[in-house]
């Protein structure tokens, strides 16, 4: 049974600025147009493009996705597991819910429709405050005041995220401090690590975990990111949506990933784990010192192997969808996403992880898990 709809607004790991990480989430088949987002590296531009794609969905290139390497476009099946339930554009249930809100949506122009969809995003869960995870949200934020009836937005995050957003982004220097505006349409709120938070609009639990994401260039101080568990309270099904991450550092006293996987294995039966959206930024050829707080296939497979060991299932992680995000667009001959996907599948088979379903997160598509 499909429980979660996940629309990929952006999954690019840089250095190109287009479509950096942002996912919008909703329960499957609901009639409510409200949405939540994980990260805000993309936004209204990508929503507008998806609405245009939906209007032109019969123009014949639905099964090709942008690549810009060996070919400018490649068949979608090169990037995804054959069993992945995926659709180009916004989900039909979301579009239908918007139409039911009023006849004006059907007759509205594309820009007005874009505003309608964006206004439905009431909550952002930010993994960390790097620009590629917040730029769309920040630039889009004044649109909250474009319409009198626009909904308020709350930006959630662990303290390492919210403190930086308040001090260094919404500070009237880098960007207007819209959190101080009288109507309070934009709020920043802190979450506590490992503490269950009830989602404000869906019958979901949200559980954030702090993870490592490298060290500062100048200070050498640890940089942190966040993994979010979203749990549907009715079905008990869960998805994990990850920010940037590296393996636990040997010199650190914090075994954050080890603690996270232990929590997952102890609290989420494998049958209820619908999918993991997780970064794998660089191919195997990358040296450890070139990862800069990210994962390559060997390190991601190591983490999945640790999870497999904790579950101790005779079938491995069979049936689990792993959606790979944040691949860097490096100047290679072959699309790095295809290289990384091939390497991950080979290593997963070598480690006997079972029928692990590994796919690449594709911008402009919706997943049904």
From Swiss-Prot:
It catalyses: a nucleoside 3',5'-cyclic phosphate + H2O = a nucleoside 5'-phosphate + H(+). Its EC number is 3.1.4.17. Pfam families: PDEase_II (PF02112). Keywords: cAMP, Hydrolase. GO terms for biological process: adenylate cyclase-activating G protein-coupled receptor signaling pathway; cAMP catabolic process; negative regulation of glucose mediated signaling pathway. The keyword Transcription regulation does not apply. GO terms for molecular function: 3',5'-cyclic-AMP phosphodiesterase activity; 3',5'-cyclic-GMP phosphodiesterase activity. InterPro entries: cAMP-PdiesteraseII_CS, Pdiesterase2, RibonucZ/Hydroxyglut_hydro. It comes from the Eukaryota. Controls the level of cAMP in yeast cells, together with the high-affinity cAMP phosphodiesterase (PDE2). Belongs to the cyclic nucleotide phosphodiesterase class-II family. Present with 1400 molecules/cell in log phase SD medium. This is 3',5'-cyclic-nucleotide phosphodiesterase 1.
């Amino acid at each position: 049974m499909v429980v979660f709809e996940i629309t990929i607004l952006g999954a690019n790991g840089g250095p190109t600025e287009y479509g950096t990480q942002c996912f919008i989430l909703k329960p499957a088949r609901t009639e409510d147009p409200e949405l939540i987002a994980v990260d805000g590296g993309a936004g209204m531009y990508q929503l507008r493009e998806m609405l245009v794609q939906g209007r032109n969905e019969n123009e014949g290139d639905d099964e090709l996705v942008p690549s810009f390497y060996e070919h400018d476009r490649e068949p979608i099946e090169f990037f995804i597991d054959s069993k992945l339930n995926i659709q180009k554009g916004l989900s039909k249930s979301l579009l239908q819910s918007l139409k039911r809100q009023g006849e004006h949506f059907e007759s509205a122009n594309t820009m007005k429709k874009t505003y309608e969809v964006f206004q439905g995003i009431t909550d952002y869960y930010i993994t960390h405050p790097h620009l590629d995870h917040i730029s769309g949200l920040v630039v889009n934020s004044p649109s909250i005041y474009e319409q009198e009836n626009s909904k308020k937005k709350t930006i959630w995050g662990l303290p390492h995220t919210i403190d930086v957003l308040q001090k260094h982004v919404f500070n009237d220097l880098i960007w207007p401090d819209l959190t101080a505006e009288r109507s309070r349409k934009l709020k920043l709120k802190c979450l506590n690590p490992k503490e269950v938070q009830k989602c404000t609009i869906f019958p979901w639990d949200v559980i954030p975990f702090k993870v490592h994401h490298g060290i500062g260039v100048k200070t050498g101080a640890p940089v942190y990111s966040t993994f979010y568990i979203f749990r549907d309270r009715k079905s008990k099904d869960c998805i994990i949506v990850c920010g940037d991450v590296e393996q636990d550092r040997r010199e650190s006293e914090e075994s954050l990933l080890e603690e996270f996987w232990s929590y997952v294995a102890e609290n989420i039966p494998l049958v209820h784990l619908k999918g993991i959206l997780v970064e794998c930024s660089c191919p195997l050829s990358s040296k450890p010192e070139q990862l800069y707080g990210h994962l390559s296939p060997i390190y991601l497979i190591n983490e999945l192997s640790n999870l497999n060991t904790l579950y101790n299932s005779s079938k491995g992680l069979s049936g689990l969808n792993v959606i790979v995000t944040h691949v860097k667009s490096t100047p290679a001959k072959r699309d790095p996403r295809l290289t990384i996907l091939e390497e991950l599948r080979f290593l997963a088979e070598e480690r006997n992880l079972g029928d692990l379903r590994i796919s690449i997160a594709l911008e402009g598509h919706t997943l049904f898990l």
